[in-house]
Regions:
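Amphipathic hydrophobic-ligand
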Residues: 8-10
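Serine-hydrolase catalytic core recognition
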Residues: 13-194
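A short beta-strand motif characteristic of beta-propeller blades
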Residues: 2-5
Length: 194
């Protein structure tokens, strides 16, 4: 695995070539609480933000908290996911759950901003959003990724059900009686299995 914990990183994309004798790299950086911005990366130095077009707009918007979680899924493997909490979250309250299932299946939820399947939108409406990266997701290792081959509804389904049960059992603020599952493409396929 490139990262020891697939929920601990921010997403970078590097559509640009390195500059100045291969010592500076331009990249776009995204996270759950920030849309894309252009940064430079230079060795051990802190990144420098070059372009942040959304900075002013985001100052007036409260964005939900997010946290990673992990559980033991199919084949005894660790499976990773995210919980996005509603605005004005109160741990003493019970919240409905929106389980978002990513497409692909060879894709993954990362700490990234999305303009189409943005979990922040559901959290803004009062849902606890659960994002699980079942077998077949990218970012862990090739065996984890390839486990979905010829078995789209097998171990990934097991991971999703085990994961949502884990969340329901370990997070007191989750309303077990008010849950829905959503997804597009492969995510829609998995919703039909559920």
């Amino acid at each position: 695995s490139l990262f020891p914990n697939p929920t601990s990183y921010i997403s970078y994309s590097t559509p640009f070539s390195p500059l100045l004798n291969n010592k500076i790299l331009f990249a776009t950086k995204v996270g759950y609480n920030c849309p894309e911005r252009v940064v430079t990366l230079q060795g051990d130095k802190p990144e420098e933000v070059i372009v942040n077009l959304n900075e002013e707009q985001l100052k007036s918007i409260e964005l939900p908290e997010h946290e990673p979680f992990e559980f033991t899924g199919g084949y005894g493997d660790q499976v990773y996911g995210w919980i996005i909490k509603p605005i004005n979250f109160d741990e003493k309250e019970k919240y409905p759950v929106a389980l978002l299932i990513h497409g692909g299946p060879e894709s993954s939820w990362t700490s990234g901003w999305s303009y189409s399947w943005n979990p922040q939108i559901w959290a803004q409406q009062g849902y606890v959003v659960v994002l699980i990266n079942p077998h077949g997701s990218t970012g862990v290792n090739s065996a984890f990724l390839n486990a979905v081959r010829n078995d789209w509804g097998g171990v990934p389904y097991e991971d999703i059900i085990t994961g949502i049960n884990y969340v329901a059992s370990n997070y007191a603020y989750v309303n077990k009686n008010k849950m829905c599952a959503l997804g597009g493409s492969y995510g829609g396929y998995m919703v039909n299995w559920i």
